[in-house]
Amino acid sequence: MAKHLFTSESVSEGHPDKIADQISDAVLDAILAQDPKARVACETYVKTGMVLVGGEVTTSAWVDIEEITRKTVREIGYTHSDMGFDADSCAVLNAIGKQSPDINQGVDRADPAEQGAGDQGLMFGYANNETDVLMPAPITYAHALVKRQSEVRKNGTLPWLRPDAKSQVTFAYDDGKIVGIDAVVLSTQHRDDVSQADLIEGVMETIIKPVLPAQWLNKDTKFFINPTGRFVIGGPVGDCGLTGRKIIVDTYGGMARHGGGAFSGKDPSKVDRSAAYAARYVAKNIVAAGLADRCEIQVSYAIGVAEPTSISIETFGTGKVSEDLLIKLVRQHFELRPYGLTAMLDLARPIYQATAAYGHFGRNEFPWEATDKAEILRADAGL
């Protein structure tokens, strides 16, 4: 493989689309806390002065949508009208209805193990050995930058920061191996009274340098910090936000393929979410077992059918065993039916709001990041 560049981006928790994702998942968590068997599809729209929460829910639980919404916005940091968006004064509109009985009859079964998929679709999981969390480096460090922005904003280190921010990191590769960072972009919302010089110095010294490994930076690395020169108007005032619009940020930063389905606001019966988590679990364990340096798995489903309609694996020439053997091992050691994968990863519980900012993958607090199958996969592969 020749020399090449690869870029991934991330956005902060205060980005309008991420506000929407977090509200949708906060509603989901509140419902699952009372009713683990609930069916939830919650979508959120945010714009200046308002939040619209809609979707379809089937549950025995009652939750206070308005209070959940305000609490989520408050925790993100939109707490004053001078930001253009205030958790305590924004309007909250509730347009949630019931899930279609046509979907219910396709999903629910007398035998829970035969629960059908909540929809058709294809999902991908991916892992590689570029980082210690077995994720691509560009998305890993793009997330780390905006996570650091949030930390220094909230702890007062840089008090002039505001919640909305974006990052982008370009890595240079030679023969598939990282040789450095070519470019870094970080744009952050800020108070009107901070100078561009102070902002650039603060971001470089407090956010960028502590996050990016020094061995990957050199005299030719390009830095673009608030390149427009001003980012005072941000959040829902600057752009409207919608649930599910940051699917590449949420996954692998473009280094793996994507089936198109978003995650936030969906309960585990929706394979868009749960099967993508299971696919990451499979791919990560294959790489952790040393069976490949890079692994991408695709699974697909038909609505109302429990068994996946297909499983395929690609190791990009890095596999230590055949891809046919890998598929056989996956079928032997992983449960990919909707009910089974929900049980395997313990997904029917309120763990989702934390996933809705800074990526769903590469964070070891989540069950689909465990590598507990690596040892048996390696043994059964004969390595």
Swiss-Prot record:
ATP binds at residues 15, 164-166, 230-231, 239, 245-246, 262, 266. PROSITE patterns: ADOMET_SYNTHASE_1, ADOMET_SYNTHASE_2. CDD domains: S-AdoMet_synt. K(+) binds at residue 43. GO terms for molecular function: ATP binding; magnesium ion binding; methionine adenosyltransferase activity. It catalyses: L-methionine + ATP + H2O = S-adenosyl-L-methionine + phosphate + diphosphate. One of its GO terms (biological process) is S-adenosylmethionine biosynthetic process. Keywords: ATP-binding, Cytoplasm, Magnesium, Metal-binding, Nucleotide-binding, One-carbon metabolism, Potassium, Transferase. Belongs to the AdoMet synthase family. Catalyzes the formation of S-adenosylmethionine (AdoMet) from methionine and ATP. The overall synthetic reaction is composed of two sequential steps, AdoMet formation and the subsequent tripolyphosphate hydrolysis which occurs prior to release of AdoMet from the enzyme. This is S-adenosylmethionine synthase. It comes from Shewanella baltica (strain OS155 / ATCC BAA-1091).
